[in-house]
Amino acid sequence: MSQTVGATRLAYSRVWHHISAVTPHPTLSTIKAPSEAITPPSLGRLASRIATILMGKHKPIWDPSTDCGDYVVVTNCAGLYTTGHKKWRKTYYRHNTRPGSLQAITMDALMEKHGGAEVLRKAVSGMLPKNRLRDKRLARLKAFEGDAHPYKENLVRFGGKVVGAPGWEEAVKAIREADMERL
């Protein structure tokens, strides 16, 4: 039995998670009415889940003073889902501390100028703790406008299939059945 307590290499290894911003998620999505289909996760729910993964709060070894979070690859940010009129009424402000330099931009203008990835990055940044680890955690967020991204080989795989990809549930069932037969 290992007597090592604290920062073991295996415990702090980083995993790559994939999240699609337009695919309905069983826990992050909401149902508007019983007759309607499940909506994609809203911007806030998606950002809070991403912030949790970036901080490492989903791990049993989580500690606020250590950086044990994982990488997150978010695709299809161009189709971010927002509720209500936020897309046209939400305003982002910036100021460079000089008189008269306050600038404002709405969410739809920001999405046209920089894309949905920047909107998601700002939302996640607001949900991370404001400390020295914030920039390091945000650097592990990789957001893309479409499906294509260069991190396909790094994503978490279970039974040879990328977790969350079509058909990965069947791979999990096959592995579980094989384990039950073996036991």
Swiss-Prot record:
InterPro entries reported for this sequence: Ribosomal_uL13, Ribosomal_uL13_bac-type, Ribosomal_uL13_sf
CDD domains: Ribosomal_L13
Biological processes annotated in GO: negative regulation of translation; translation
Keywords, ordered alphabetically: Mitochondrion, Ribonucleoprotein, Ribosomal protein
SUPFAM superfamilies assigned: Ribosomal protein L13
GO molecular function, one term: structural constituent of ribosome
Subunit structure, as described in the record: Component of the mitochondrial large ribosomal subunit (mt-LSU). Mature N.crassa 74S mitochondrial ribosomes consist of a small (37S) and a large (54S) subunit. The 37S small subunit contains a 16S ribosomal RNA (16S mt-rRNA) and 32 different proteins. The 54S large subunit contains a 23S rRNA (23S mt-rRNA) and 42 different proteins.
Family: Belongs to the universal ribosomal protein uL13 family.
Annotated protein name in UniProt: Large ribosomal subunit protein uL13m
Natural source organism: Neurospora crassa (strain ATCC 24698 / 74-OR23-1A / CBS 708.71 / DSM 1257 / FGSC 987)
